[in-house]
Amino acid sequence: MSTTTLDAAVIGTGVAGLYELHMLREQGLEVRAYDKASGVGGTWYWNRYPGARFDSEAYIYQYLFDEDLYKGWSWSQRFPGQEEIERWLNYVADSLDLRRDISLETEITSAVFDEDRNRWTLTTADGDTIDAQFLITCCGMLSAPMKDLFPGQSDFGGQLVHTARWPKEGIDFAGKRVGVIGNGATGIQVIQSIAADVDELKVFIRTPQYALPMKNPSYGPDEVAWYKSRFGELKDTLPHTFTGFEYDFTDAWEDLTPEQRRARLEDDYENGSLKLWLASFAEIFSDEQVSEEVSEFVREKMRARLVDPELCDLLIPSDYGFGTHRVPLETNYLEVYHRDNVTAVLVRDNPITRIRENGIELADGTVHELDVIIMATGFDAGTGALTRIDIRGRDGRTLADDWSRDIRTTMGLMVHGYPNMLTTAVPLAPSAALCNMTTCLQQQTEWISEAIRHLRATGKTVIEPTAEGEEAWVAHHDELADANLISKTNSWYVGSNVPGKPRRVLSYVGGVGAYRDATLEAAAAGYKGFALS
């Protein structure tokens, strides 16, 4: 057993963790990043299932603090796949010489704050300890998979795998009867990718999804030169748009004629991206009539691609509004269900009750015999990555207990009662969901780095949100969230996919630009809402 003494310990080596490590090292801190994976990449290390890829355009899903780093990598597609994304993050780690300060295959199991010394003690799964002044969590929004959901999973005689724990060696689907549980963004990517490779595919659907077609052209030298020439423009604009994408809301619904609205929807739909969702009309999140009109537009597009009226009933949503769930991009996903070897099984009213040795059993007693079960069942979003670590703050309080009652943060950057623990990709910030993740994670990691710089420059050693500061942010967050139609819908956006999880809109819905302004204003006002000592 060993003890390592640091100024700062970073948990995670994905987009946020790599950048945080780089920035704190540039300050001259003794800092190290830890990851239970055997490679860097975070989300893009773990999620190597068939079809995994960006749905942010590749050229905006990049770091914008270093022009040479940005231009030193050339993407092959508008929306590249997992293997290329993982290679890019390894390129970043190598270009910034980060590996010498990274410990892989090192799982942090506990973190305890010592009030007498104002330092954190982290313990690894191997029993080693890390003593650090600052604990920075870069664990990812979607990194705690919902795996053990059904009785009998261990009894299954075939292969059962969660998409976020996909084996590196892959799975041979030839001649196999395969079941996919879940049809969210991940499930859709898997389903459309493996349908032609399996003998039989059954998709177990609880909630139909609005899905938009992806247009994913390859990038040659001209396209690469085009996006690289836009580095300065993207650096200036992305932090200020509503979702951190290059497109933004521009027109109010009421200012356009019905014909103009339709034309705008058609143009955004034809863009082949998330533009229809994140840049057509902001009113889809607040006005039920606008939400219904845009939802019907998407339903119309989906109906036109589905031959069978029964498939329309199974696959097209009717009881919630477009955009209030995570909107997936797809490539011929709907057409997959026209294949003779693919069956959609609706389990909303006839749910899965258990996994048997030979397959999946439903409430009515039906057993679907399978050789492979793929669980595209999502994550304990925002909170699970931290509550699965035994994190203890002041007075022995635990984060798991605190968040089991009420999910609260201060700007998604800290939690009252946990001094010097700074967080990324946790609730009550845009990085919880409604954001191009690199835009939001860069904002948060830069704020954290600057806060630590400020403490050191002023001779302070501790930063902690005040109870009043946290309450003010929670109230502001909830006021915006309660006016948003996302709050009226059941999805992981409000934590309803996790039994017993307190309901709260996880993502800050005031916009990326507004969030950035709020965090910078707090810092400029002497870290208003935080106590420094």
Swiss-Prot record:
The pH note for this entry is: Optimum pH is 8.0-8.5. Optimum pH is 7.0-8.0.
User: Which key words are in the record?
Assistant: FAD, Flavoprotein, Monooxygenase, NADP, Oxidoreductase
Going by the record, the broad EC class of this enzyme is oxidoreductase
Q: Which residues bind NADP(+)?
A: R53, F54, D55, N183, G184, A185, T186, G187, I188, Q189, R206, T207, W492
Q: Which molecular-function annotation in GO is an example for this chain?
A: N,N-dimethylaniline monooxygenase activity
State if Oxidoreductase is listed as a keyword.
Answer: yes
Q: Which residues bind FAD?
A: T43, W44, Y45, W46, D55, S56, Y61
Classification via InterPro entries: FAD-binding_Monooxygenases (IPR050775), FAD/NAD-bd_sf (IPR036188), Flavin_mOase-like (IPR020946)
How is the co-factor bound, per the entry? Binds 1 FAD per subunit.
Give the similarity note. Belongs to the FAD-binding monooxygenase family.
Q: What does this protein do?
A: Plays an important role in the metabolism of acetone derived from propane oxidation. Catalyzes the oxidation of acetone to methyl acetate. Exhibits high catalytic efficiency towards various linear and cyclic ketones, such as butanone, 2-pentanone, 2-heptanone, 2-octanone, 2-nonanone, 2-decanone, cyclobutanone, cyclopentanone and cyclohexanone. Elicits the highest catalytic efficiency towards butanone and cyclobutanone. Is highly specific for NADPH and cannot use NADH.
This chain belongs to the protein called Acetone monooxygenase (methyl acetate-forming)
Organism of origin: Gordonia sp. (strain TY-5)
